[in-house]
Structure formats: C-alpha cells, structure tokens
C-alpha cells in the first residue's frame, strides 16, 4: 500500500511540475543571439536584466512580446551609439511605474526604427531618444506603432526626445516631447502623421544648477490628428520637472512649427502664413484645412490665417468667416478681413422636352445678367414664361 501511495505522490509531483517546466521552456529569458544581423523570435521574452545592443541588428518579433519579471530593474533595451537597430511586429509590455515618471523602457543612443510595434508601460517613459552631448544624439523613426505610458491619473511620455526623431504614423496615448537643456543636444521632432491623444510639446529645461539652454527644442508638424495640447513651454527641476511661465530676460525659447493636421487646440501662432481654419473648436491647418473647407456641405468655417493670394472653392450652404487680417477669395468673390460670405444655393429650372422628359438647368442665386449686370430675377421670369409657352405648345400638339 505504501508503494502505491509513493507512486501516486510521484505522479502528482510530475503533473504539478510539467506546466512549470513547459512555461520555462516556452519563453526566452533574454534576447537570442543574432544570426546574419537578424533575431527572429519564435516565443516571448521575459527579461530579468537589461539588454544592451551593441551591434547592427533587426529584431523580428513575429507577433511575440517582451515583458519583465517583478524584480526587473533598468532599461528593457538600450541601443548604444554607433549601431543601427530595427524592431518590428510585436509588443513590449513594461508593468513598472513610479510617481516621478523616471523609469524608461527603451533607450536609444544609436539609430532605432520602430515598425508595427505596440509599447506600453506604467507611469514613466516608453521610448527615450537620448543624446551624448551637443553633437551626438540618437536618431529615432516610428512607423505605425501604438505607444502608451501612464495611467488615467498620471500620464507619462510616449516619446521623450533629446535627439532627432521622425514619427510617420501610429497612435500615441502619452505625451510626445522634444527637450533641450544647457550644454546638451536640443531635441528635434518631425511628425508626418498619426493620432496623438495627449500633449505634443517643445520644452526648454532648466536643471536650476545649469541655467536655461541656449539652443531650442524643435517640433515640426506636417500632418496628423492632435487631441491634446500642442505648445511650447518651460520646465524647471529634475524629473519630474515643473512647468513655469516664460522667464524674464534674454532666454532662448522652444520652437513649434505647424504646416498641416487637425487639432483640438488653437495652433494659429505656430502656423506661420499657412492656412488655418476653425470649425466648432477644431482647427485645420494647411492641406487639411483646404480639404475640410472644400469637402464640407454645410457649417461655418473661420479663416484664422492665410496667404495674400488664398483662393477657396466652397460648396453651396457653407459660410466662410474671414478673420485672417487679409482679403481672401471664395468662389471668385473677394471677402475682406472681418466679413463673411455664405455660398448661395442653386436654382433649378425644369424645361419639358418634346418627348415629355425634362432637362435641368442649374443656376446660382448670384448669377448676373451678362448684358445688364442685374440679378437673374429677370432671367428667371423669362425662363418661367418660356416654360409656360412650351407647356402650352405641348398641350396643343397633344390635341
């Protein structure tokens, strides 16, 4: 009997350990070694220590993810300067967070491309594009990625940029900030598209002990949808730094340039002489503004900024309010600053044909009689008379 019990207990222990053994075998505990410049994941990676990349490599996630153990400390991935790395097609999930927001998941000092990635973390920095002094910085490109950092109460930074970053597309659920500090490289971010659900900022940082930077953080926006604030600003202190008003004296400011996109905040001051229009609290800039106006079938659009030769083609029923400080042209009509113009509807004249069918002749309300320059009321009356005569002629023929 004791032998039977012993065998049963042994089998039970094997049954208990099998899932643990399988789990241990089903994940990597660090990134595999590259082969011919490529790492192709065939299972998830659970990190207990930082991965430092000091080679040119492409990491194909193949739908797998990298995540951390409960005791993990450091960066998930550190790309050292001088190396080119591409990460694509997977998830990076960092469960850590702190109130200071100083924990970083991915840190880049080299050249890093993120493609079709989902990166999420608690309060902190999802991707830091770092620098190594005024002339050496990380270069980052982001394409079709979803990046989230923070919680509903405390937002983190999706991208903290001290180097050169280009965002082509994606969804960003935390701040995207370009930074500058005294003695360091000023961050420069170019945004060509994407959806930004938090703030996009260019920020000048004073560590207090070093003073204000003498170079400008820069953000250039060419397109995208921006649901948070887009602005420049000043910050003081170590992380987390505090926003402060513009300091007095000769202090270098950050730069923001907006050439296109859709915004929930007023970005007119950053648009130069690019077309800016507003409709119900939404601001459209550049080609996006022109598309919004010319595709609209109703509503009121306020032109906030425009070039001297701006000409718009607008559908009937749309009202254009010109607050651009210059005269613009709407459907060949001059609209001075401070005035508005509603594009009139159409008049449809139905003329019976010999076969009993009708032909439709559209005409706008503001069409002029070419001989007199008068409004078309005379023409409409004449057309009605013609319709009556044609109708009578048709009746006579039917008899």
Where are each of the predicted segments found?
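Sec-dependent signal peptide cleavage junction
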Residues: 17-27, 367-378
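Sec-dependent, cleavable N-terminal signal peptides
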Residues: 1-24, 391, 398-399
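Acidic Gly/Asp/Thr-rich repetitive segments characteristic of extracellular carbohydrate-active
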Residues: 25-46, 50, 276-304
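All-beta strand scaffolds that present successive hydrophobic residues in beta-strands
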Residues: 59-61, 84-89, 112-116, 140-144, ...
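A cross-kingdom C-terminal cell-surface attachment/processing module
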Residues: 376-397
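Extracellular beta-strand-rich solenoid/capping regions of secreted or surface-exposed proteins
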Residues: 46-58, 66-88, 94-112, 123-135, ...
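C-terminal low-complexity, Ser/Thr- and acidic/Pro-rich disordered "stalk" regions positioned immediately N-terminal
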Residues: 338-372
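Solvent-exposed loop/turn tips at the surfaces of repeat/solenoid architectures
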Residues: 59, 64, 89-90, 95, ...
């Amino acid at each position: 009997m004791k032998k039977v019990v012993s065998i049963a207990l042994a089998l039970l222990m094997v049954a208990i350990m099998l899932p643990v053994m399988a789990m241990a075998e089903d994940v990597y505990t660090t990134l595999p070694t590259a082969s011919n410049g490529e790492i192709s994941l065939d299972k998830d990676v659970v990190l207990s220590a930082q991965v430092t990349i000091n080679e040119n490599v492409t990491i194909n996630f193949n739908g797998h993810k990298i995540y951390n153990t409960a005791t993990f400390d450091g960066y998930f991935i550190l790309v050292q300067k001088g190396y080119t790395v591409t990460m694509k097609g997977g998830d990076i999930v960092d469960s850590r967070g702190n109130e200071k927001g100083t924990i970083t998941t991915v840190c880049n000092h080299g050249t890093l491309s993120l493609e079709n990635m989902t990166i999420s973390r608690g309060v902190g920095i999802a991707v830091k594009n770092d620098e190594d002094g005024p002339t050496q910085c990380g270069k980052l490109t982001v394409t079709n990625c979803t990046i989230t950092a923070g919680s509903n109460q405390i937002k983190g930074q999706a991208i903290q940029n001290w180097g050169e970053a280009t965002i082509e597309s994606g969804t960003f659920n935390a701040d995207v900030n370009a930074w500058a500090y005294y003695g360091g490289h000023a961050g420069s971010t170019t945004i060509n598209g994407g959806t930004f659900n938090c703030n996009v900022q260019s920020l000048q940082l004073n560590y207090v002990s070093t003073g204000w930077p003498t170079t400008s953080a820069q953000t250039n926006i060419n397109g995208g949808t921006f649901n948070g604030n887009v602005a420049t600003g000043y910050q003081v202190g170590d992380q987390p730094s505090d926003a402060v008003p513009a300091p007095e004296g000769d202090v270098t400011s950050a730069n923001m340039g907006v050439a296109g996109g859709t915004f929930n905040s007023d970005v007119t001051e950053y648009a130069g002489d690019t077309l800016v229009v507003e409709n119900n609290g939404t601001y459209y800039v550049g080609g996006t503004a022109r598309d919004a106006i010319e595709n609209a079938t109703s509503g009121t659009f306020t032109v906030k900024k425009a070039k001297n030769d701006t000409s718009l083609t607008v559908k009937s029923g749309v009202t254009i309010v010109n607050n651009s400080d210059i005269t613009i042209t709407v459907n060949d009509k001059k609209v001075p600053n401070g005035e508005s113009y509603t594009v009139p509807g159409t008049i449809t004249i139905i003329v019976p044909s010999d076969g009993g069918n009708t032909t439709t002749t559209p005409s706008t309300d503001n069409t002029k009689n070419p001989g007199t320059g008068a409004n078309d009321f005379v023409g409409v009356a004449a057309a009605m008379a013609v319709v009556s005569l044609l109708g009578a002629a048709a009746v006579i023929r039917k008899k």
